[in-house]
Swiss-Prot record:
Its EC number is 2.3.1.117. This is 2,3,4,5-tetrahydropyridine-2,6-dicarboxylate N-succinyltransferase. It is found in: Cytoplasm. InterPro entries: DapD_Trfase_Hexpep_rpt_fam, Hexapep, Hexapep_transf_CS, THP_succinylTrfase_dom1, THP_succinylTrfase_N_sf, Trimer_LpxA-like_sf. One of its GO terms (molecular function) is nucleotidyltransferase activity. PROSITE patterns: HEXAPEP_TRANSFERASES (PS00101). Keywords: Acyltransferase, Amino-acid biosynthesis, Cytoplasm, Diaminopimelate biosynthesis, Lysine biosynthesis, Repeat, Transferase. NCBIfam families: dapD (TIGR00965), PRK11830.1 (NF008808). It comes from Acinetobacter baumannii (strain SDF). Pfam families: Hexapep_2, THDPS_N_2. It catalyses: (S)-2,3,4,5-tetrahydrodipicolinate + succinyl-CoA + H2O = (S)-2-succinylamino-6-oxoheptanedioate + CoA. Coiled coil: none annotated. Gene3D superfamilies: Hexapeptide repeat proteins (2.160.10.10), Tetrahydrodipicolinate-N-succinyltransferase, N-terminal domain (1.10.166.10).
Amino acid sequence: MSQLSTIIEQAFEDCANFTAADCPSEIRQAVEEAIAGLDNGTLRVAEKINGEWVVHQWLKKAVLLSFKLNDNKPIESCDLRFYDKVETKFSGWTEEQFKAAGVRVVPPAVARRGSFQAKNVVLMPSYVNIGAYVDEGTMVDTWATVGSCAQIGKNVHLSGGVGIGGVLEPLQANPTIIEDNCFIGARSEIVEGVIVEEGSVISMGVYIGQSTRIYDRETGEIHYGRVPAGSVVVPGNLPSADGKYSLYAAIIVKKVDAQTRAKTSLNDLLRAD
C-alpha cells in the first residue's frame, strides 16, 4: 500500500506536467487500482483507528487524478444518455452480483463507480458520489445525496432530501462523517467535514458546517465541527452579545433516550434479503 500511495502522492504533485494522453502507465495503473479499491470497499478515504478518524489524503488525490486522466464519454441508461468521466457503479451488473453484494437499488438511484455500499444498504432514488463509503444496514432515502468521499456508518438513516457534503468542490480537507446508528432528519445538510458522532439524532431541517455553532442547552457548551455522541439536535438561534439580533445555531436539546429511539428506530423488514 505504501508504494501505491507514494505513486499517487508524487503524481498529484506533478500533475501539471502530464495530460491524459501522455500520462505514464504507472500513474494510470495506480489511480485505477485506488479507484477499484474504493469501489469494492477494501480502501476508504477515512477510517477510525484507535478511536480517532484518520483521513487518507492520498485516496482523495487519487479521485481528483481520475478526473484528469479520464475523458468524458457517452453513458447509456435505457432511453437516457449522459456524458461524464465516471461510470455508474452498477452498470452491467447481473442479478448474481446484486445478490452477492446484498445491496438494494431502487430506480432511479445512482451511485458512481468508486463508491462503496455494504451489505443490506438500501438506495432509494438517491445519489452517492465517488469515494463515498456507505456501511451495512444504512438507508439512503429519496433524493438524499452522499457527497464525494463522505463516510456513512452502520445502521444510519439518511432521510428524504438530506445532503451530506463532499470534498471535491469546494475543496475540503476532510470528509463529512456520519458515525454508526445515527438518524439524519429530512432536508438536513451536514457539510464541510463535520463529524456526527455515534447514535446522534439530527432533526428535520438542521444545517451544520464548520462555522455552525452547536449549542448544548444543558451545559452551555458550544461545539464546532462535531456533534457529540448520542445528541438530539434541532434547528434554533442564539442571541448576539448586544441582544439586537440572533443567528442560526444547531441546538442539542437532550441526549438520546428510549422515546427518541422509538421514534427513529430502523425497520428490519426493509433490509431483509
